[in-house]
């Protein structure tokens, strides 16, 4: 299990507690709060130390700074390791891959991988491709259509909730599901391109590279050559940023489809509003049907049941 520690102020810890309100669990002695997300278990202590432990603690910690205060110079390219990309790769011909839907109770997980040459990267920038976190759903859908019109090679995978829940019941962590989705998306994309022009692969890092490799090895797969990992990859690589938009657009469309099928709007995220909607859905369709709409191992399921 990986871990990440940050040191912050008590004011920031209170903001964090409010942010994780719907995911709080029992608080251990000496702690201010403990919360459990799909990426990590977060424990905040009176000393100001916040510990993130789980399959992707870096991803969760990055929301709050990701590194101890006054230590950011060590992270000029985020967390450096033997699988870190060289800066020049970001402007060369490369594949980028990213996912969406992992922290959302309702809806699937989607993963996209996209290959862009130097020339295509310029076109992607011209149509407004950038970090999808700074774009609303309407803009994401629009740019995703424009990416498709550019005929830039990509692959897009969707893991529906029913399959997600079956894998989770078999003992798969979400980290393993994401690793296999990234691997298969890249596999499919490699079949569409001339690999001789490929200089490398950039994956938006959600776990340590050795952990990612173990996930692949457990399914008798191996890491693709020249694969690199970096956190916040979409802010470095236009290929990852474009893949992120494609994955997010597919997730948003899937949420629209599920909402129409459920005959109620299914909110994104994992907030108290999600708990209330899940309770309504259970009343309307029965608990068994929840499997088609939600990641049922999330704490929201138990919270929804308490509202019935």
Curated annotation (Swiss-Prot):
<feature type="binding site">
    <location>
        <position position="98"/>
    </location>
    <ligand>
        <name>a divalent metal cation</name>
    </ligand>
</feature>
<feature type="binding site">
    <location>
        <position position="99"/>
    </location>
    <ligand>
        <name>a divalent metal cation</name>
    </ligand>
</feature>
<dbReference type="GO" id="GO:0000287">
    <property type="term" value="F:magnesium ion binding"/>
</dbReference>
<feature type="domain" description="RNase H type-2">
    <location>
        <begin position="92"/>
        <end position="308"/>
    </location>
</feature>
<dbReference type="GO" id="GO:0004523">
    <property type="term" value="F:RNA-DNA hybrid ribonuclease activity"/>
</dbReference>
<comment type="function">
    <text>Endonuclease that specifically degrades the RNA of RNA-DNA hybrids.</text>
</comment>
<keyword id="KW-0378">Hydrolase</keyword>
<dbReference type="GO" id="GO:0043137">
    <property type="term" value="P:DNA replication, removal of RNA primer"/>
</dbReference>
<protein>
    <recommendedName>
        <fullName>Ribonuclease HIII</fullName>
        <ecNumber>3.1.26.4</ecNumber>
    </recommendedName>
</protein>
<dbReference type="InterPro" id="IPR024568">
    <property type="entry name" value="RNase_HIII_N"/>
</dbReference>
<keyword id="KW-0460">Magnesium</keyword>
<dbReference type="GO" id="GO:0032299">
    <property type="term" value="C:ribonuclease H2 complex"/>
</dbReference>
<dbReference type="InterPro" id="IPR024567">
    <property type="entry name" value="RNase_HII/HIII_dom"/>
</dbReference>
<dbReference type="GO" id="GO:0005737">
    <property type="term" value="C:cytoplasm"/>
</dbReference>
<dbReference type="InterPro" id="IPR012295">
    <property type="entry name" value="TBP_dom_sf"/>
</dbReference>
<keyword id="KW-0255">Endonuclease</keyword>
<dbReference type="InterPro" id="IPR036397">
    <property type="entry name" value="RNaseH_sf"/>
</dbReference>
<comment type="similarity">
    <text>Belongs to the RNase HII family. RnhC subfamily.</text>
</comment>
<feature type="binding site">
    <location>
        <position position="204"/>
    </location>
    <ligand>
        <name>a divalent metal cation</name>
    </ligand>
</feature>
<dbReference type="GO" id="GO:0006298">
    <property type="term" value="P:mismatch repair"/>
</dbReference>
<keyword id="KW-0540">Nuclease</keyword>
<dbReference type="InterPro" id="IPR001352">
    <property type="entry name" value="RNase_HII/HIII"/>
</dbReference>
<dbReference type="InterPro" id="IPR004641">
    <property type="entry name" value="RNase_HIII"/>
</dbReference>
<keyword id="KW-0479">Metal-binding</keyword>
<dbReference type="InterPro" id="IPR012337">
    <property type="entry name" value="RNaseH-like_sf"/>
</dbReference>
<dbReference type="GO" id="GO:0003723">
    <property type="term" value="F:RNA binding"/>
</dbReference>
<keyword id="KW-0963">Cytoplasm</keyword>
<dbReference type="Pfam" id="PF11858">
    <property type="entry name" value="DUF3378"/>
</dbReference>
<dbReference type="Pfam" id="PF01351">
    <property type="entry name" value="RNase_HII"/>
</dbReference>
